[in-house]
């Protein structure tokens, strides 16, 4: 961690700036949390979306959701106060979670690209290649690697420079410290190499998909199935494209920090590229809805069911109140005493003593 340093001058004043940034960050956090919750609900409640491919999408959504719950609120507090308001131990946990969730996002997207490659290039053998057991092993692999690369390296100090931190528990800065080796290894292994493989994979997917579309143009049933696969591929490629746009600047700065040191990077620019990367977690649910019809349908059904249930509840309440008012208006002020019939749980009927009335 970077524990030393002073508060930047731009953080001292500018109330309007802080209010504007606060609104933007709050909206980003809310969209991230709500959007990824909806993705998980949509897959869980819609049978059409319960596929092996969507297991990786749910894993990605869970990753983004955890980022929105465990990292972004503290990042926003740190961004607005321009100092770390918590302990040094919690700083280590916070930065480890940040690195872990970022790595998990990359590996989920990497697995998604491999899944799409198998589905498009060899659809007949896809059920044999992509089995529930292999998907489960892949998900375990993703999270084990992510935890190892984050918590292990940071808590063992593999990323630290030859700087001694203060012994007290109060710190000003809290961000991942980067040395030359850690910057290059982490940047290459967790971002640039997976990114290169994903780009090659998607290029081959689109090339083969175009050839297949021409070859099966006159076969109706295969055409419908292939079009569905191609639409899913386009959607997931758009998700990966958004990931590149959002995270490529950050990892470039990350590697540059490792080579040149923290003083070589402007802090404002570093904050901008960091939050640009965080914004990717809010974009994925929007991309699903915009580019995938199955997810659009699931979202529509989810919100319509909630709205219909709410309207039905309100209508029922109004109807019951109306009937109650009508019965009260028609009821005489006094009634003859008559036997009161009481239904008990066993289904038998009990007659109340004479003098009990229906009230």
UniProtKB/Swiss-Prot annotation:
Q: Identify the PROSITE patterns for this entry.
A: G_PROTEIN_RECEP_F1_1, G_PROTEIN_RECEP_F1_2
Disulfide cross-links: 91-174
Q: What does this protein do?
A: The H2 subclass of histamine receptors mediates gastric acid secretion. The activity of this receptor is mediated by G proteins which activate adenylyl cyclase.
Among InterPro entries, the record links this protein to: GPCR_Rhodpsn, GPCR_Rhodpsn_7TM, Histamine_H2_rcpt
Topology of this chain in the membrane: Multi-pass membrane protein
Keywords of this entry: Cell membrane, Disulfide bond, G-protein coupled receptor, Glycoprotein, Lipoprotein, Membrane, Palmitate, Receptor, Transducer, Transmembrane, Transmembrane helix
* Gene Ontology cellular component terms for the protein in this record: dendrite; plasma membrane; synapse
Residue ranges, Cytoplasmic side? 45-57, 115-134, 205-234, 290-359
- Nucleotidyltransferase among the record's keywords? no
Q: Which family does it belong to?
A: Belongs to the G-protein coupled receptor 1 family.
Intervals, Extracellular compartment: 1-22, 82-92, 160-180, 259-267
Q: Which organism is it from?
A: Cavia porcellus (Guinea pig)
Q: Which GO terms describe its molecular function?
A: G protein-coupled serotonin receptor activity; histamine receptor activity; neurotransmitter receptor activity
Identify this protein by name. Answer: Histamine H2 receptor
- Subcellular location, in the record's words? Cell membrane
Question: Where is the site labelled Essential for histamine binding?
Answer: 98
Q: Where is this site: Implicated in histamine binding?
A: 190
Q: Among its keywords, does the record have Ribosomal protein?
A: no
For this protein, the record's SMART domains field holds:
7TM_GPCR_Srsx (SM01381)
């Amino acid at each position: 961690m970077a524990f030393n340093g002073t508060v930047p001058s731009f953080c001292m004043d500018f109330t309007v700036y802080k209010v504007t940034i606060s609104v933007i960050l709050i909206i980003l956090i809310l969209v991230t949390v709500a959007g990824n919750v909806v993705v998980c609900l949509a897959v869980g409640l819609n049978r059409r979306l319960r596929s092996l491919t969507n297991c990786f999408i749910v894993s990605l959504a869970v990753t983004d959701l955890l980022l929105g719950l465990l990292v972004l609120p503290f990042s926003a507090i740190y961004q607005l106060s321009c100092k770390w308001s918590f302990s040094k131990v919690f700083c280590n946990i916070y930065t480890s979670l940040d690195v872990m969730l970022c790595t998990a996002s990359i590996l989920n997207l990497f697995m998604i690209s491999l899944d799409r490659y198998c589905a498009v290039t060899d659809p007949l053998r896809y059920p044999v290649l992509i089995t529930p057991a292999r998907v489960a092993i892949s998900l375990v692999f993703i999270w084990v690697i992510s935890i190892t690369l984050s918590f292990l390296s940071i808590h063992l100090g593999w990323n630290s420079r030859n700087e001694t931190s203060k012994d007290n528990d109060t710190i000003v800065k809290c961000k991942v410290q980067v040395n030359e080796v850690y910057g290059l290894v982490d940047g290459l292994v967790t971002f640039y190499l997976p990114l290169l493989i994903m780009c090659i994979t998607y290029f081959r997917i689109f090339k083969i998909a175009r050839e297949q579309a021409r070859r099966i143009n006159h076969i109706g049933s295969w055409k419908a199935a292939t079009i569905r696969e191609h639409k899913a591929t386009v959607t997931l490629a758009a998700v990966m494209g958004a990931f590149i746009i959002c995270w490529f600047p950050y990892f470039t700065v990350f590697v540059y920090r490792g080579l040149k040191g923290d003083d070589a990077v402007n802090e404002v620019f570093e904050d901008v590229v960091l939050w640009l990367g965080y914004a990717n977690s809010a974009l994925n649910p929007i991309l699903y809805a915009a580019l995938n019809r199955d997810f659009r349908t699931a979202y529509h059904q989810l919100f319509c069911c909630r709205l219909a249930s709410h309207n039905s509840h309100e209508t029922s309440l109004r109807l019951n109140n109306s009937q109650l008012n009508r019965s009260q208006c028609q009821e005489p002020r006094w009634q003859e005493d008559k036997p009161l019939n009481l239904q008990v749980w066993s289904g038998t009927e009990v007659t109340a003593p004479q003098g009990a009335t229906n009230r």
